[in-house]
Amino acid sequence: MKFLLILLLQATASGALPLNSSTSLEKNNVLFGERYLEKFYGLEINKLPVTKMKYSGNLMKEKIQEMQHFLGLKVTGQLDTSTLEMMHAPRCGVPDVHHFREMPGGPVWRKHYITYRINNYTPDMNREDVDYAIRKAFQVWSNVTPLKFSKINTGMADILVVFARGAHGDFHAFDGKGGILAHAFGPGSGIGGDAHFDEDEFWTTHSGGTNLFLTAVHEIGHSLGLGHSSDPKAVMFPTYKYVDINTFRLSADDIRGIQSLYGDPKENQRLPNPDNSEPALCDPNLSFDAVTTVGNKIFFFKDRFFWLKVSERPKTSVNLISSLWPTLPSGIEAAYEIEARNQVFLFKDDKYWLISNLRPEPNYPKSIHSFGFPNFVKKIDAAVFNPRFYRTYFFVDNQYWRYDERRQMMDPGYPKLITKNFQGIGPKIDAVFYSKNKYYYFFQGSNQFEYDFLLQRITKTLKSNSWFGC
């Protein structure tokens, strides 16, 4: 389950502040920026040296750039006016860029009929107004999905709505008026799905104070399994702002995200049980659709699932693709990583998606023909990036192309036959990835071939699922 917060920070920012400024105000802003980046962008403050490099080091600059890119700001790497203003804006406290170890697996409800109960009522509003605001917030999501929500007055509900102040039993205390607005938990048992609202805020039905309906729509999105969107028009965008509730609508991005988890309103069939539909990991006939590294992890894609294998560790976890990337399709057919850029490319049919820091980039998918493929190429079977040559190899049927990532163009003289230049590797490759110890791992059906690209020969034949201790 993912713990989520909304922060409402009232300080104001002024001036563009270089990271090496020595004034008290500038240092206060830098310290505030560090705390912000630690919370939302994974800045490891303990690793920063306790010197002026703390304020000018590349690590913090990179995190500022990461934040600016995600939130649609001009990427300067500095704590300039617009960046500080965004840092002080009302927002949700879940990190904008996740390290995968922090992500829950498959955070969706495995049923279409979900109950909620309002545990207690804020004195700021009439009970009827609270009931109406919460009911309408749930209705926003039921209008675009097959989900049905029912309010119960007693007993155990799937989602519990609570108004509380200070420490309230979940190890995530509220901090009084003007700080944390609310938090929620992702789908699951126990506290899973519950939404908590800070009683020290002044809850309202209008633009004054804090609008309960708008806050609840955002929090319920998290309760249903949605993360944040980088689309500023989306209700799931990290920052909070009031909009006219009479004309409020979910954005296209919100709708795509929630429907990727639950389908559209016409899909009233029971959600598949993952115990029945998840491929058996140690099935000797198991094959994969795509495989790629992501940092020190290996992702194995199959249908709507992926397995996550951390290098040198025996433990493996299986997740829904939609749990990490709600807007992406199932059935990923090829994938590769450029680790130095924190980029992953995912392919299906004649389209591809770009993932940066585990977040989908806007304005995707794009056509695979933008790489320079001829029109007769309709899909990519497999792809792999070699950092030694800074080239990506694309495998299609019995041929392969080589792409120069620096010049952003295909190398001349391609395509070439796979069998001619990859001795022992046959056509129709299912998946391939590169290992830092000089090997390609080619997957064909239930078999896997360790290939030394320096010696240009197969060095080992394995089962495709040998990475999992099968």
UniProtKB/Swiss-Prot annotation:
Binding site for Zn(2+) 1: 168, 170, 183, 196
Keyword check for Hydrolase: yes
Binding site for Ca(2+) 4: 289, 333, 381, 430
EC identifiers of the protein: 3.4.24.65
Proregion span(s): 17-105
Sequence motif Cysteine switch, residues: 90-97
Domain remark text: The conserved cysteine present in the cysteine-switch motif binds the catalytic zinc ion, thus inhibiting the enzyme. The dissociation of the cysteine from the zinc ion upon the activation-peptide release activates the enzyme.
UniProt-recorded name of the protein: Macrophage metalloelastase
Source organism: Homo sapiens
Gene name of this polypeptide: MMP12
